[in-house]
Amino acid sequence: MSISSLELQIQTLPDNPGVYQYYDKDGKILYVGKAKNLKKRVSSYFNKVHDTAKTNVLVKKIVTIKHIVVPTETDALLLENNLIKTLQPRYNILLRDDKTYPWICIKKEPFSRLFPTRKMVKDGSEYFGPYTSFKTVSVILDLIKELYPLRSCNFDLSQKNIENYKFKVCLEYHIGNCKGACEGLETLENYQTQINAIREILKGNFKDSMKDFKKVMTNLAQNMHFEEAQKIKEKIEILENYQSRSTIINPKITNIDVFSIVSDEAAAFINFLQISHGSIIRSHTLEIKKKLDETDQELLELAIVELRERFQLLSREIIVPFEVEVGENIKVTVPQLGDKKQILELSVRNAKFYRIEQLKQLQIVDPERHVNRIMAQMKKDLRLSVEPRHIECFDNSNIQGTNPVAACVVFKDGKPSKKDYRHFNIKTVEGPNDFASMEEVVYRRYKRLLDENQPLPNLIIIDGGKGQLSSALKIIDELDLRGKIAIIGIAKRLEELFYPGDSIPLYLDKKSETLKIIQQLRNEAHRFGITFHRDKRSKAALNSSIETIPGIGEKTMLTLIKHFKSVKRLKLAKEKEISDLIGISKAKKITDFYSKLDN
């Protein structure tokens, strides 16, 4: 793969958190890294000469860049750690040990203990995390202990042992950190109530507990214990930023494969995540070109079989967005809520980003092919006889019947051609009449193009639905252009398109590029028209205001209108700025006039 191909991969990376992976020409993993912004981080490797020889050698070997997009920077850190341990990249020397991030464990036992750990034991205990720093773990545990006195001993507090007085209370009991469950001084029911509250805190549901923490802080401050109150305040701030759950590592999800699909008119993009022991260990996205009108279900089933065979996947459960048929021995899960739904959404996110990147790459490498593809798709979607290489869209701007104007925007090859934009002052229509206004501007536009022998558009889009379409069509017939130019109307609901002589609208897929371009056309026509209307109103207001100033003639008035464009800007202008334009005497008249008006 050439350098240009590598640059192309970098240019189309997303500006999102994630993990990037570098591969050499033989497909061997070189390096795994995390990023708050994938594009910026990866670009930094190639934009400078590095201080260390090792990094310079690494950069020279990179041929392929892969990445996984994740929701947060914390998730990126966790995924990086996990992939480094799984893939053992050559250049991640410092992170190739067995270090894992800490968890908080609620031990499955009578009078459950709460403690940090790096190892997970499958004995029914509950684990929360992982956390990216032990400081966060310590703060959470300290705050919990402020509210909930729990035992710290490792005694076997069975009912029998307690009844036989096998244990004695320790110093923790005497200083108030424990309620003496070992001697039966606290009931299991009361202790369990505390554990339930702690469980909610660790899940991130700590609204009620936060009130209690703040109450402790307030009491300390009222009793003049300001240093202790400040420490509690700092801990609360850390807790407020605490992320209770990671999408990347979840002990409840064991060995499962996740498949999702994002498709358009030409292709489908299937993302695959492999989950092993609660962690993502592989991500891959496959593109399948459509031959016929294959459904997403057909394409996803095909991809699942292909990917399971390619990567020799043996998991007995798969997570998918809808039901699929892939064999009797595989459990198919379509999650609606919870952890599995979150991991499916992560897969969908990566499929979407991959599709965007592929389209960007095509646009950079072969812009003509990219345009041809879009034009062919628009021709098919809109049932046109020719590709809509030249589109014009009309919009009326008529607010409260004042200063009626209209706008015509032009797109060529799917892109705005701003030099061809035109706006119109409505000349022949009195009062608010959108239908008559549309007739006027369509007539003026195409009568002029015909008189000047200018090229006509392939498609006219009328913003306003059936009524506006009928008005425009009347003029198209009058100019003998019916059949020479295609014309459609857009209803208020953007996905509804109306055609001449057809009362039933055409509905476009909300994901289609055709609809996106039509939406862009309408938004641009609306923006262009509103801007012109606003400027016209401002000039009218300025004109009206200046006309009332004694000693200011028409020529001076036009000079001021051309320069300031609005009353507000004229009022705020310094006298010197005005005098430089029209002379000291007239400038004084204007500033005195507005000064008296304000007073």
UniProtKB/Swiss-Prot annotation:
Domain of life per record: Bacteria
* Biological process according to GO: nucleotide-excision repair; SOS response
Q: Which CDD domains does the annotation name?
A: GIY-YIG_UvrC_Cho
Q: Which molecular function terms from Gene Ontology are attached? A: DNA binding; excinuclease ABC activity
Gene3D superfamilies noted in UniProt: 5' to 3' exonuclease, C-terminal subdomain, GIY-YIG endonuclease, UvrC, RNAse H endonuclease domain
Pfam families from the entry? Answer: GIY-YIG, HHH_5, UvrC_RNaseH, UvrC_RNaseH_dom
**GO cellular component terms?**
cytoplasm; excinuclease repair complex
Q: Which residues form the GIY-YIG domain?
A: 15-93
Boundaries of every UVR domain copy: 207-242
Record localization: Cytoplasm
Keyword set, alphabetical order: Cytoplasm, DNA damage, DNA excision, DNA repair, Excision nuclease, SOS response
Q: Which family does it belong to?
A: Belongs to the UvrC family.
Q: Which PANTHER family match?
A: UVRABC SYSTEM PROTEIN C, UVRC/OXIDOREDUCTASE
Q: Subunit composition?
A: Interacts with UvrB in an incision complex.
The cross-references to NCBIfam families, in alphabetical order and at most eight, read: uvrC (TIGR00194)
Q: What does this protein do?
A: The UvrABC repair system catalyzes the recognition and processing of DNA lesions. UvrC both incises the 5' and 3' sides of the lesion. The N-terminal half is responsible for the 3' incision and the C-terminal half is responsible for the 5' incision.
Q: What is this protein called?
A: UvrABC system protein C
